[in-house]
């Protein structure tokens, strides 16, 4: 098997993401695991919200919804050691200079989504685009978030923390700064439904970049 897909995504990362969906999905819900390949990302959605909090995904310890299925994947070496799969994915993506995975878990919809961006960390074109924000003295974490927002279209506090590894206090400060600078526009007014979309400055930078 090839070590990487055509997009440069490590094969093991994609395999682990798919296996993870089958190990942790809810089989009480009669719906297939959905694997959607967009031009810039892969999203894998399975029935069943995460039994672990999103913040603790990737930390030691595993809560398998289907232990017998998990055992089969582990015994056949199709899955990493219990509780280490996400951690291994992050390491491999970092080694390949790609963004870390992001996750969404919904109790209401009873679904879990894992997202893999097919984008290498800030390349030459990205650097050129990000120069348009130099006046705002953005951190590397904020710049990474802007690349994510450009590729996906929306960003929330949780996604920011998953991308950067900062705590909730720092992520809130970073996002507020970009909102006050009109780089981002805030939508929603509560912790559960607040997210961010491109603001006036962000949209203007894209228009200029496309004309160059």
Model-derived segments and spans:
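C-terminal regulatory or interaction extensions
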Residues: 1-212
